[in-house]
Amino acid sequence: MRSTFLLAISLLLGLISSAQTPCESGFAGIYPCSGYDLQSRLTMAQIGGGSGNDIWGWTSSTGREFAIMGRSSGTSFVEITNPAFPVYLGNLPSHTSNSTWRDIKVHNDHAYIVSEASGHGMQVFELSRLLTVTSPPVTFTEDAHYAGFGSAHNIVIDEASGYAYGVGTNTFSGGLHFVNIQNPAVPVAAGGFSEDGYTHDAQVVVYNGPDAAYVG
């Protein structure tokens, strides 16, 4: 019995090891590479299905690492602390309908998720919940929701001030939509900017240069 168990373990380890693909002659399997190996791969079907368009990440205070994948029907969470053994933890379904576009940013251990799905708004998910998943995969629920806009192409966060900026929303002519996220449980509308029209993406910083008229 013991020898059978050891044989099974050996076969399993052999299968797992085969998932790691070394970078040889500029390729790790079918993927171009330069000085790094392919540690593992999960298909879209293995992490909730549909198509994917955005990926972000989060590292816990204890050093555990997670990938956050925006998909057409929801958001997937995958632990990648050991990159050779990724674990699909679960899915946060779309707040409304499916959409090709779903984007994520992370601030203070929370994920902020927007989509071009009509009426979707901004989902808020407390990432520390990932640390206690014991029987994956699970279906998550959002911890908070902001409905000040419906659809949005992307979201930008200024970590210094604790403000999020929806871009390409159905408000402010598609310009910047400001949201105070200093309390992630209660996102608060803080205005917007429409003079430049539709904004596809952005980077937000607090100006601290020589021109006093623009400081702050």
Predicted regions and their residues:
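Positively charged n-region of N-terminal signal peptides that target proteins for export
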Residues: 1-4
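Feature marking well-ordered beta-strand scaffolds used for ligand recognition
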Residues: 19-216
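Bacterial N-terminal signal peptides
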Residues: 6-14
